[in-house]
Structures are given as C-alpha cells and as structure tokens.
A protein has these predicted regions:
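Amphipathic alpha-helical packing segments from all-alpha helical-bundle domains
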Residues: 102, 111-137, 144-148
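Amphipathic alpha-helical interaction segments
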Residues: 9, 50, 85, 102, ...
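Helical hydrophobic small-molecule/effector-binding pocket
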Residues: 57-61, 80-105, 112, 155
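N-terminal intrinsically disordered/low-complexity leader segments
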Residues: 1-5
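Helix-turn-helix
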Residues: 9, 13, 17-50, 54
C-alpha cells in the first residue's frame, strides 16, 4: 500500500477507535484493531500526540468551512437567515458519531483539543455572531454567554443523538 494511503487508513482507524474508547485509548490496542504493528503507526505518526493532532485536524478543524465567517457578517441578509444557514451547514458537518464522541471524551479527559477548538470557534464564528446579533437588535444587549447558550443548545441535540443515543429532531 502506498504510504499516503496507509497513513489515511491509520488515521481513519484512529478516528473510529478514539470515538469509541476516548483519547486515552492506547496505540497497542489501536494497532491490534487495525491489524498493523505499533511501529507502523509510529512510522506515520511519530508520537501518540502527533496522531491525536491529526485526528483533531481531520475531525474538528477540517469541518469549519472558510465561508462561514463571511456568511455570518453578510449584512445584506437578515440575521435570522444567516444563522439558520450557518447552523444548518454546521450541524451537517459536525453531527457525526466521531465528532460528538471525540469532543465529549476530550472534555472529560481534560485534553487540550476541545479547548483549542472552542477558542478557535469563538474567534472565527461566535464572536462575529455576537457582534452581528448586537448590531441587529441593539448594542450590548446580548453578551458572550447568550451566544454560548444558543450554540450549546444546538450542540446538545447532537449530544443527545450520539452520546445518549436518544431520538432527536
């Protein structure tokens, strides 16, 4: 198998594995699951941290669409239409078994991955969303916690679906 194909195969397996067992899962068990040696994993990812970084990039960062900040700031459209479009696209991107479970495990295990993701999301999406909300209604009416409540209520639908495995809209 070509090295890039093998790397993709290991990364896909790691995403599935970490979604099932959490980021504390070990590379020995991962290698057994994939039917490869640990040394092959470390050939493509020199450390477990490097593997987790690749998982973070694939599962979290690669799903943030570059047009979302402009969409949120496009005042030629009503704010409600912008928010509906953003959250339709965003939930389509993140409402997956892997995203939700890795995100939850990362938080429970105290990993830095979701703190970094949330910091990035706040800078790129949520802070501009707050600015637009205040521009649409009245300056300083909404605060950061209002945006987090909005965002959190939508994310909670995914948590119910993929973590609690309960019916959702």
């Amino acid at each position: 198998m070509a090295p890039e194909d093998r790397r993709r195969q290991i990364l896909a397996g790691a995403v599935s594995y970490f979604a099932e067992v959490g980021l504390s899962g070990n590379t020995r068990d991962l290698s057994q699951r994939l039917g490869v040696t640990q040394s092959l994993i470390f050939k493509h990812f020199p450390t477990k941290t490097a593997l987790q970084e690749a998982v973070y990039e694939q599962v979290f960062l690669s799903r943030i669409e570059p047009h979302w900040p402009a969409l949120i700031r496009d005042r030629s459209r009503p704010l409600l239409a912008r928010l509906e479009q953003f959250y339709t696209e965003y939930t389509r991107a993140i409402f997956t078994y892997e995203w939700m479970r890795i995100f939850m495990f990362s938080g429970l295990e105290g990993a830095e991955l979701n703190r970094r993701y949330l910091g990035h999301l706040q800078q790129v999406i949520l802070s501009p969303m707050l600015e637009e909300l205040n521009a649409a209604i009245a300056p300083e009416v909404a605060g950061p916690e209002d945006i987090w409540r909005l965002h959190g209520s939508i994310i909670y639908i995914g948590i119910r679906r993929f973590v609690y495995q309960t019916p959702t809209p």
